[in-house]
Curated annotation (Swiss-Prot):
UniProt: GTP binding residues: 19-26, 81-85, 136-139
Key words, A-Z: Cytoplasm, Elongation factor, GTP-binding, Hydrolase, Magnesium, Metal-binding, Nucleotide-binding, Protein biosynthesis
Xref: HAMAP family: EF_Tu_B (MF_00118_B)
Presence of keyword Metal-binding: yes
Job of this protein: GTP hydrolase that promotes the GTP-dependent binding of aminoacyl-tRNA to the A-site of ribosomes during protein biosynthesis.
Bridged cysteine pairs (disulfide): none
Lineage: Bacteria, Bacillati, Cyanobacteriota, Cyanophyceae, Nostocales
Protein name in UniProt: Elongation factor Tu
Keyword Ligase: no
Region of interest (G3), ranges: 81-84
InterPro entries noted in UniProt: EF-Tu_GTP-bd, EF-Tu_GTPase, EFTu-like_2, EFTU_2, G_TR_CS, P-loop_NTPase, Small_GTP-bd, T_Tr_GTP-bd_dom
Subunit details: Monomer.
Length: 409
């Protein structure tokens, strides 16, 4: 069987904890797993197990990320928590841990801090659709009025970054108190402790406020071309991994990028040397194309549902520039810098025409380790869309990672 199906009874949602350092993200993550473990819907993870996050590589960049999973009555969740601020920045920009929504953790004792603002901005720019707020360390706040003020300030901040500040659920509680109760009595159920109930209240908010993600298979068809070859008597085959949607024999698809966009008809689909009627998201497939010569198509183009994606040469992006220690550049670069932009399956040369700091202030040069907004012009048009990830490379090594925030031309 080439296509065993993974059946899941509940919708799957990817989320993560974001927020300022020491505001209690990891403690809250541990508290969620321990609370839901009492219902048999999670494996309890202690703080240390989450804090010692393993290293992973995404787009040539090393990131520390902890993954936990748990279920509520309605959904199955994969949850990411990062130990360090730089890990969050890299994680969100590379899309290593795709988030369908996030829990913004804010310590009531501090209120919103610089990284709170930075994570909200990042979430907006990389396309995290919805946030739920956990106002942590409520046990350390005597003054109810002060709590109200912090909440008000948060709602204003969220609105400033175009989230729905008025409607976002803000749940007050204490991750530490809940974790403490669950550690002493791992069987504590809902209704037996006010701090544990706050965790349930938070999960109810996440369940109801963060929407079910659209599955890749329901999106318009797209496959980035990795390789091309001719089959005598049958025509030209493009191979690659189907990124989203599905494709059937007889479908008309568009060939987009590098050269003028053109239509062609799919006359065959193969996977594991067997022919299929239909290929779908996640499949590594070979697609036979009518009336296309081997010279008409090359790596870096995409096959897509007609009209679903267009070629562009200019875009704005959010970029993280690697430090020397991470394998990046030793020296700064200036406007006019010409690296390669690795998009899906190919390197395209482009120029970084202009850049600003993340908050939009003018900067003279970019240092390794900086996070910046860039305007890029590519030498060839490529199928690009908002939210798409790319790597920046120089002589074959990755020196930065980015996400497209806006198409210019």
């Amino acid at each position: 069987m080439a296509r065993a199906k993974f059946e899941r009874t509940k919708p799957h949602v990817n989320i993560g904890t974001i927020g300022h350092v020491d505001h209690g993200k990891t403690t809250l993550t541990a508290a969620i797993t321990m609370t839901l473990a009492a219902l048999g819907q999670a494996v309890a993870k202690g703080y240390d197990q989450i804090d010692n996050a393993p290293e992973e590589k995404a787009r040539g960049i090393t990131i520390n990320t902890a993954h936990v999973e748990y279920e509520t009555a309605n959904r199955h969740y994969a949850h990411v928590d990062c130990p360090g601020h730089a890990d969050y920045v890299k994680n969100m920009i590379t899309g290593a841990a795709q988030m369908d929504g996030a829990i913004l953790v804010v310590a009531a004792t501090d209120g919103p801090m610089p990284q709170t603002r930075e994570h909200i901005l990042l979430a907006k720019q990389v396309g995290v659709p919805k946030l739920v707020v956990f106002l942590n360390k409520e046990d350390m706040m005597e003054d109810a009025e002060l709590l109200e003020l912090v909440e008000l300030e948060l709602r204003e901040l969220l609105t400033e970054y175009e989230f729905d500040g008025d409607d976002i659920p803000i749940v007050r509680g204490s991750g530490l108190q809940a974790l403490d109760v669950m550690t002493k009595n791992p069987k504590t159920q809902r209704g037996e402790n006010p701090w544990v109930d706050k965790i349930y209240e938070l999960m109810d908010a996440v369940d109801s406020y963060i929407p079910d993600p659209e599955r890749d298979i329901d999106k318009p068809f797209l496959m980035a071309v990795e390789d091309v070859f001719s089959i005598t008597g049958r025509g030209t085959v493009a191979t690659g991994r189907i990124e989203r949607g599905k494709v059937k024999v007889g479908d008309v698809v568009e060939l987009v990028g590098i050269r003028d966009t053109r239509n062609t008809t799919v006359t065959g689909i193969e996977m594991f040397k067997k022919s299929l009627d239909e290929g779908m998201a996640g499949d590594n497939a070979g697609v036979l194309l009518r009336g296309i010569q081997k010279t008409d198509i090359e790596r870096g183009m995409v096959l897509a549902k007609p009209g679903s994606i267009t070629p562009h040469t200019q875009f704005e992006g959010e970029v993280y520039v690697l430090t020397e220690k991470e394998g990046g550049r030793k020296t700064p670069f200036f406007a006019g810098y010409r690296p390669q932009f690795y998009v899906r399956t190919t390197d395209v040369t482009g120029t970084i025409k202009a850049f600003t700091s993340d908050e939009g202030e003018a900067v003279e040069m970019v240092m390794p380790g900086d996070r910046i907004k860039v305007t890029v012009e590519l030498i060839n048009p490529i199928a690009i869309e908002q939210g798409m990830r790319f790597a920046i490379r120089e002589g074959g090594r990755t020196i930065g990672a980015g996400v497209v925030s806006k198409i210019v031309k």
